[in-house]
Swiss-Prot record:
Quaternary structure, from the entry: Homodimer.
CDD domains tied to this protein: RNaseZ_ZiPD-like_MBL-fold (cd07717)
Gene3D superfamilies, alphabetized: Ribonuclease Z/Hydroxyacylglutathione hydrolase-like (3.60.15.10)
Binding-site residues for Zn(2+) 2, renumbered to this chain: D66, H67, D215, H273
Cofactor list: Zn(2+)
Family: Belongs to the RNase Z family.
Keywords: Endonuclease, Hydrolase, Metal-binding, Nuclease, tRNA processing, Zinc
Keyword Nuclease: yes
InterPro entries: Metallo-B-lactamas, RibonucZ/Hydroxyglut_hydro, RNase_Z/BN
Annotated active site: D66
Protein name: Ribonuclease Z
Amino acid sequence: MNITFLGTSSGVPTLTRNVSSLALKLSQTAEVWLFDCGEGTQHQLMKSNIKSSQIKKIFITHMHGDHIYGLPGLLATLGLSGNSNGIEIYGPSELKSFVTSALESSFCKLSFPLRFRAVEDFASLNKILFENDKLKVHCACLKHRLPAYGYRVSEKDKPGVFDIKKAEDSNIPPGPIYSELQAGKTVQLKDGRSFNGQDFCGPPRKGESFVYCTDTVFSKSAVNLSKNADLLVHESTFSKEDEKMAYEKLHSTTIMAAKTALLSNVKKLIITHLSPRYTQRSSIKPSDLLKEAQKIFPNTYLAKDFLTAEIK
């Protein structure tokens, strides 16, 4: 799996950063899952290597405009191209009325169904938000000025590496039967011999995990959600020098994001959602924000629009 940042600015877009949105490209299928959809997201998609037609799920963290204003427009555009299977949208309960009102008021009729799922109960009760045979999604309550939710996408463990040579040495003819053995199934050949696939596979390979936390001040629930994840994307709206403002607005500093990564034992941290006050011409530059976080958590990277990063 990999992610592509479509917007990395906090509050308002800048000349170099759009407002919040991130695309997760699944390795198991051709699907793309979108996290937040600020104004201008569909334009960012056009500039990226992400195909909007592959978007099947959209996860919204909270109802602030810089995270949702691009959603009705994106859905309207997708409606022109057609998407017969529909799109699932996860987020706060108010999200459904916002989207349907915008579409109805503009006389927009989609050519595909929208399926909304409110996340409040799943977050408060620590229930699985979504699960299939390869992935599961959890969410958790964050700490912001209005209800906000972080998301974790966890890939289930994959079968171990299949030992082709061992299968060949056992005179098992190559073909579809190898796939069954790799899946751990017991198969019987035409000559009557039976083989257990687990005997031909190495130990299971641990699945990848990705966590997206914004907007929030430092939160223990974000730490718990991020435990042992391969990649944490966490907001870092403010420098440590502006900590007072972070507490007033319930946003994170670079130190808070790095502390979350450290306490949750993640492998890699990418900081995003930067305040537009930090530019190449300001006294505190984006590169300074990165250095602040790296002092606490060395394996930290700075997000920028269109950056693509592997989960593991």
